[in-house]
């Protein structure tokens, strides 16, 4: 099994996924003020099993929260926990902007749509609304605007 996660400014989502890519469990919780104790309670309450976890991968725009979750999950599973931007993705996707300036959530969105044939304008409605451009497996960047809730 795999643990996949998305740590945003407002919300963190964690999925437990089978080797056949079936979502077994999904948990959402606030990214604000997360502690080891709160994380432990959330995962116990959701009957999260660590025994069979083989790999852990996150995209995160909140480094402090990722570091806390990384240490917690690495300890519980005895596995390394990786962040998408820390992986060498140059052979997977071409990025035409400063890679350091792009959030891993935006890179992950682009990778998820790559098919070599189609071009995409990628919209993501989170705390911020992002608009990104993917042309034939090349990420050209985009813009960030206030999220829907902030705009109301």
How does the language model describe each region?
Residues 31-35, 114-116, 141-152:
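Glycine-rich phosphate-binding loop plus the immediately following alpha-helix
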Residues 10, 105, 128, 143-144, ...:
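Gly/Ser/Thr-rich beta-alpha loop segments that engage phosphate groups in nucleotides
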Residues 2-80:
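Conserved phosphate-binding loops in N-terminal lobes of ATP-dependent enzymes
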Residues 50-102, 135-148:
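Short beta-strand-loop/turn "lid" adjacent to the catalytic site in phosphate-handling enzymes
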Residues 1-24, 113, 117-137:
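Gly/Thr-rich phosphate-binding beta-strand-loop-beta motif of the actin/hexokinase/Hsp70
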Residues 36-40, 91-95, 151-152:
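Short, charged, surface-exposed secondary-structure boundary motifs
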Residues 91-120:
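Conserved phosphate-binding catalytic cores of ATP/NTP-utilizing and phosphoryl-transfer enzymes
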Residues 66, 106-110, 152:
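A general structural signal for well-ordered alpha-helical segments in protein cores
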């Amino acid at each position: 099994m795999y643990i996949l996660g998305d740590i945003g400014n407002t919300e963190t989502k964690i999925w437990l996924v089978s080797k056949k890519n079936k979502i077994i469990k999904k948990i959402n919780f606030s990214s604000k003020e997360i502690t080891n104790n709160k994380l432990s309670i959330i995962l116990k309450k959701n009957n999260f099993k660590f025994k069979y976890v083989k790999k852990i991968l996150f995209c995160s725009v909140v480094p402090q929260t990722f570091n806390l979750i990384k240490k917690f999950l690495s300890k519980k599973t005895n596995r390394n926990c990786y962040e998408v931007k820390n992986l060498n993705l140059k052979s997977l996707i071409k990025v035409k902007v400063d890679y350091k300036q792009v959030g891993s959530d935006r890179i992950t969105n682009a990778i998820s749509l790559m098919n070599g044939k189609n071009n995409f304008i990628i919209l993501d409605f989170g705390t911020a609304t992002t608009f990104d451009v993917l042309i034939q497996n090349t990420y050209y960047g985009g813009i960030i605007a206030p999220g829907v809730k902030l705009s109301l």
